[in-house]
Amino acid sequence: MSFVIWITGPSGAGKTTLANALYKKLESMGYRVELLDGDGVRRKLYPNLGFSEEERWMHNRVVVEMARRLSRNGIITIVSVVSPYRAWREYARKEIEKFVEVYPRCPLEVRMKRDPKGLYSKALRGEIKGLTGLDGEYEEPENPEVVVDTDKNDR
Protein backbone atom coordinates (compact mmCIF):
# COMPACT_ATOMS: atom_id res chain seq x y z
CA MET A 1 0.00 0.00 0.00
CA SER A 2 1.51 3.30 -1.05
CA PHE A 3 0.21 6.71 -1.91
CA VAL A 4 1.25 10.36 -1.90
CA ILE A 5 -0.07 12.89 0.59
CA TRP A 6 0.39 16.30 -1.07
CA ILE A 7 0.21 19.09 1.53
CA THR A 8 -0.13 22.48 -0.13
CA GLY A 9 -0.44 26.00 1.25
CA PRO A 10 1.37 29.31 1.68
CA SER A 11 4.18 29.87 4.16
CA GLY A 12 3.06 29.60 7.77
CA ALA A 13 -0.10 27.60 7.01
CA GLY A 14 1.17 24.55 8.89
CA LYS A 15 2.41 22.32 6.05
CA THR A 16 5.65 21.29 7.74
CA THR A 17 4.06 20.78 11.16
CA LEU A 18 1.33 18.61 9.65
CA ALA A 19 3.80 16.69 7.46
CA ASN A 20 6.11 15.95 10.40
CA ALA A 21 3.21 14.75 12.57
CA LEU A 22 1.93 12.46 9.79
CA TYR A 23 5.42 11.13 9.17
CA LYS A 24 5.98 10.29 12.85
CA LYS A 25 2.57 8.62 13.16
CA LEU A 26 2.91 6.49 10.03
CA GLU A 27 6.48 5.51 10.87
CA SER A 28 5.48 4.52 14.42
CA MET A 29 2.83 2.26 12.88
CA GLY A 30 5.52 0.43 10.89
CA TYR A 31 4.88 1.91 7.45
CA ARG A 32 7.63 2.71 4.98
CA VAL A 33 7.33 6.47 4.68
CA GLU A 34 9.35 9.37 3.27
CA LEU A 35 8.88 13.10 3.69
CA LEU A 36 9.70 15.44 0.82
CA ASP A 37 9.83 18.98 2.14
CA GLY A 38 9.90 21.51 -0.69
CA ASP A 39 12.47 23.72 1.03
CA GLY A 40 14.66 20.72 1.88
CA VAL A 41 14.58 19.39 -1.68
CA ARG A 42 15.47 22.82 -3.01
CA ARG A 43 18.35 23.24 -0.52
CA LYS A 44 19.85 19.81 -1.26
CA LEU A 45 19.37 19.47 -5.01
CA TYR A 46 19.64 22.99 -6.41
CA PRO A 47 20.45 25.61 -3.76
CA ASN A 48 21.01 28.35 -6.34
CA LEU A 49 17.59 27.99 -7.96
CA GLY A 50 15.60 31.20 -7.84
CA PHE A 51 11.91 31.83 -7.31
CA SER A 52 10.70 32.92 -10.73
CA GLU A 53 7.51 31.25 -11.87
CA GLU A 54 9.50 29.09 -14.31
CA GLU A 55 11.95 28.01 -11.59
CA ARG A 56 9.16 27.23 -9.13
CA TRP A 57 7.34 25.18 -11.82
CA MET A 58 10.55 23.21 -12.46
CA HIS A 59 10.93 22.61 -8.71
CA ASN A 60 7.32 21.41 -8.52
CA ARG A 61 7.88 18.95 -11.39
CA VAL A 62 11.01 17.55 -9.71
CA VAL A 63 9.11 16.98 -6.45
CA VAL A 64 6.26 15.32 -8.38
CA GLU A 65 8.70 12.93 -10.05
CA MET A 66 10.45 12.10 -6.77
CA ALA A 67 7.11 11.42 -5.06
CA ARG A 68 5.87 9.35 -8.00
CA ARG A 69 8.95 7.13 -7.94
CA LEU A 70 8.89 6.65 -4.17
CA SER A 71 5.21 5.76 -4.22
CA ARG A 72 5.67 3.41 -7.15
CA ASN A 73 8.23 1.56 -5.02
CA GLY A 74 5.84 1.00 -2.13
CA ILE A 75 6.75 3.99 0.02
CA ILE A 76 4.08 6.26 1.46
CA THR A 77 5.27 9.72 0.51
CA ILE A 78 4.35 12.94 2.27
CA VAL A 79 5.02 16.10 0.26
CA SER A 80 5.06 19.51 1.90
CA VAL A 81 5.29 22.17 -0.79
CA VAL A 82 3.59 25.47 -1.62
CA SER A 83 2.58 24.53 -5.22
CA PRO A 84 0.53 27.74 -5.51
CA TYR A 85 -1.44 27.03 -8.68
CA ARG A 86 -4.27 24.56 -9.17
CA ALA A 87 -2.82 23.56 -12.54
CA TRP A 88 0.43 22.53 -10.85
CA ARG A 89 -1.44 20.41 -8.33
CA GLU A 90 -3.57 18.89 -11.09
CA TYR A 91 -0.35 17.97 -12.88
CA ALA A 92 0.80 16.18 -9.70
CA ARG A 93 -2.57 14.42 -9.41
CA LYS A 94 -2.33 13.18 -13.01
CA GLU A 95 1.26 11.98 -12.64
CA ILE A 96 0.81 10.23 -9.29
CA GLU A 97 -1.48 7.19 -9.24
CA LYS A 98 -2.71 7.45 -5.63
CA PHE A 99 -2.81 11.12 -4.68
CA VAL A 100 -4.33 12.73 -1.59
CA GLU A 101 -4.41 16.53 -1.51
CA VAL A 102 -4.34 18.08 1.95
CA TYR A 103 -4.97 21.78 2.45
CA PRO A 104 -3.94 23.29 5.80
CA ARG A 105 -6.29 26.27 5.72
CA CYS A 106 -5.10 29.23 7.76
CA PRO A 107 -5.99 32.95 7.68
CA LEU A 108 -3.33 35.43 6.56
CA GLU A 109 -3.21 37.16 9.96
CA VAL A 110 -2.31 33.87 11.68
CA ARG A 111 0.30 33.00 9.02
CA MET A 112 1.84 36.45 9.45
CA LYS A 113 1.96 36.01 13.22
CA ARG A 114 3.64 32.60 12.90
CA ASP A 115 6.05 33.73 10.14
CA PRO A 116 8.39 30.74 10.66
CA LYS A 117 10.92 31.85 8.03
CA GLY A 118 10.57 35.60 8.48
CA LEU A 119 9.18 35.92 4.95
CA TYR A 120 6.16 38.04 5.84
CA SER A 121 8.36 40.46 7.81
CA LYS A 122 10.74 40.74 4.85
CA ALA A 123 7.84 41.27 2.43
CA LEU A 124 6.33 44.00 4.61
CA ARG A 125 9.72 45.76 4.74
CA GLY A 126 9.89 45.57 0.93
CA GLU A 127 12.84 43.16 0.92
CA ILE A 128 11.00 40.52 -1.10
CA LYS A 129 8.20 40.80 -3.64
CA GLY A 130 5.60 38.29 -4.77
CA LEU A 131 5.37 36.28 -1.55
CA THR A 132 2.83 33.54 -2.21
CA GLY A 133 -0.31 34.19 -0.20
CA LEU A 134 0.51 37.86 0.44
CA ASP A 135 1.24 39.83 -2.75
CA GLY A 136 1.89 36.66 -4.77
CA GLU A 137 -0.97 34.47 -5.91
CA TYR A 138 -2.05 31.29 -4.13
CA GLU A 139 -5.05 29.48 -5.62
CA GLU A 140 -6.84 27.63 -2.84
CA PRO A 141 -7.64 24.01 -3.67
CA GLU A 142 -11.19 23.55 -4.96
CA ASN A 143 -11.74 19.93 -3.92
CA PRO A 144 -8.94 18.66 -1.68
CA GLU A 145 -9.49 15.28 -0.08
CA VAL A 146 -8.66 16.77 3.33
CA VAL A 147 -8.92 20.30 4.78
CA VAL A 148 -7.32 21.03 8.15
CA ASP A 149 -8.08 24.37 9.82
CA THR A 150 -4.63 24.87 11.30
CA ASP A 151 -5.45 28.16 13.00
CA LYS A 152 -7.48 26.15 15.52
CA ASN A 153 -4.42 24.28 16.79
CA ASP A 154 -0.78 25.32 16.53
CA ARG A 155 0.58 21.87 17.40
Swiss-Prot record:
GO terms for biological process: hydrogen sulfide biosynthetic process; sulfate assimilation via adenylyl sulfate reduction; sulfate assimilation, phosphoadenylyl sulfate reduction by phosphoadenylyl-sulfate reductase (thioredoxin). Pathway: Sulfur metabolism; hydrogen sulfide biosynthesis; sulfite from sulfate: step 2/3. It catalyses: adenosine 5'-phosphosulfate + ATP = 3'-phosphoadenylyl sulfate + ADP + H(+). Residues 134-155 are annotated as: Disordered. GO terms for cellular component: cytoplasm. Its EC number is 2.7.1.25. Keywords: ATP-binding, Kinase, Nucleotide-binding, Phosphoprotein, Transferase. ATP binds at G9, P10, S11, G12, A13, G14, K15, T16. The keyword Zinc does not apply. The active site is at S83 (phosphoserine intermediate). GO terms for molecular function: adenylylsulfate kinase activity; ATP binding; sulfate adenylyltransferase (ATP) activity. SUPFAM superfamilies: P-loop containing nucleoside triphosphate hydrolases. HAMAP family: Adenylyl_sulf_kinase. This is Probable adenylyl-sulfate kinase.
